């Protein structure tokens, strides 16, 4: 059996990163955790007599070698009024990596074991402190990469997804109750009305939750934004501008970027994975050729392409080839850069002649920042509102486990509606309804197995 289910063990873990910092937090939980910890505290009697939700100042002491390890503040929690439902201790110590390791070592000496990933949250779930949707929201909150994903995780932590699932379950239970009454009294002279419309409503609610998972994946993985163009047109300058930091080398030498550089930035709550690619041109340099091949591959796979053109120079053959291939493509924005320089007459005439729809053009200068706001507006119009419709959902499902169970419940509901149309016997309908409720119960954790919990909580970080 996994250590995750050894609830009688006293566990300890570092809840903050193992880095040099002003403070760190070490947390522990278990039936005997306070008694064991008191053996390494400077005033053990005070801790043993302490009430829950109290804070105590003192020193941690390795009594085997009679040496003080650190000056600390200790928070005491008494069962059942703690995150895990057990006696728990949180130690705030100085963030010295060496000191932290010595303190953890002292915990182990007095009888604690290292916690498994997610074990504190699992104990909270097993103690009925939170359901599985909230437990998964804890992990989503910790790993959130943007303001939007953080807000969605907080909403789920406050119970929004559980409330939605619970509402669907109550509707289906009402249907099942009516079905059961009908089966009990089908030979009676009384006719029991069965609210079949409830199943149609539940189907629609489940469909919205299933669809929301696709939106969640886009939020989690981000939008692939590729900067492409000929050499020395300002792609790397634009890359640095989007990131608001100098990540790419900017040089007047053509071919400085010989392979792609990837980084991420947040815009309007959406994560963008931006790629600064090698300039497109004919070259005999083998390494640069490989970079150009990769550039073309990234362009094809991208959600959005910013094709950068030097407005002060003549269009290259590679520019013309790209324009011919992508001039009507909705995922491409043609960025006319270097507006701060004298424009090339032929290049200006080419774009003024209507070869490209003006709605796909943005004029900028990475040097003076001219037109940058217009570029952001264009990115927003092509991605945030069209590509990811966040506001269409009151609750968004982010977990693949939840999504899979919702798909199963939705499929069964569809089958149930088909059976209703075919006048299948009510006892057969009841069997399918129980199956739907079972899948929904697995989402919240009312119906689950040890294997499911092991698989879910192993993806949590240590100390959570």
From Swiss-Prot:
Binds 1 potassium ion per subunit. It comes from the Bacteria. Disulfide bonds: none annotated. Gene3D superfamilies: P-loop containing nucleotide triphosphate hydrolases, Probable tRNA modification gtpase trme, domain 1, tRNA modification GTPase MnmE domain 2. Mg(2+) binds at residues 236, 257. Its cofactor is K(+). It is found in: Cytoplasm. Exhibits a very high intrinsic GTPase hydrolysis rate. Involved in the addition of a carboxymethylaminomethyl (cmnm) group at the wobble position (U34) of certain tRNAs, forming tRNA-cmnm(5)s(2)U34. This is tRNA modification GTPase MnmE. The lineage of its organism: Bacteria, Pseudomonadati, Spirochaetota, Spirochaetia, Spirochaetales.
